């Protein structure tokens, strides 16, 4: 009987195909996990960082430094980084919203889109307001505010805007949780 050395390679082809499909499936599953991880990390870093800073660091700074004015000069620096983190997180949220568009229900889809749009608009506002407030602050030779009334007005707008942005962020995160909960439920089986 004639044996070809090509025969074993032909017999192994189906095994290779199934191995390739398993690898492809594993990569796809892990990409989903990576996406969820990145979204959760963005939530934790930006919204979590903002919540901790506003709820703990600022009040403690006021207590230790003796007033809002002193902590304001620290806040001026920190909020620049919060805005950078906000732009990064909002970019991640936008990608997640696009990738979730087909799999989410109409109410969740539109809530994600509306909250994202509002957060982006507010982020743009904060980025514009920040240098306007900075120009009213003098750092040398001693820390001072040039125009108290104008600064207070801008600062008040800034605080209201960040509060609305944070609230929109919480609604957005809730919608992400709804999507994750739906993904983790087993699909119903037909009898």
Question: Which role fits each region the language model picked out?
Answer:
Residues 104-109:
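Membrane-interface helix-loop-helix junctions at transmembrane boundaries of multi-pass membrane enzymes
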């Amino acid at each position: 009987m004639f044996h070809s050395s090509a025969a074993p390679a032909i017999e192994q082809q189906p095994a290779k195909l199934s191995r390739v499909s398993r690898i492809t499936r594993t990569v796809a599953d892990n990409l989903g996990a990576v996406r969820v991880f990145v979204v959760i990390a963005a939530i934790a870093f930006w919204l979590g960082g903002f919540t901790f800073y506003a709820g703990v660091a600022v009040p403690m700074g006021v207590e230790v430094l003796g007033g809002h004015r002193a902590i304001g000069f620290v806040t001026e620096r920190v909020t620049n980084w919060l805005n950078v983190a906000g732009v990064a997180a909002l970019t991640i949220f936008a990608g997640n919203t696009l990738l979730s568009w087909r799999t989410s229900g109409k109410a969740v889809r539109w809530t994600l889109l509306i909250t994202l749009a509002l957060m982006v608009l507010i982020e743009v506002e904060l980025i514009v307001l920040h240098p306007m407030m900075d120009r009213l602050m003098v750092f040398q030779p001693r820390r001072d505010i040039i125009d108290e009334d104008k600064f207070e007005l801008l600062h008040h707008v800034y605080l209201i805007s960040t509060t609305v942005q944070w609230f929109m962020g919480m609604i957005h995160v809730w919608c992400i949780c709804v999507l994750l909960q739906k993904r983790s439920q087993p699909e119903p089986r037909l009898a």
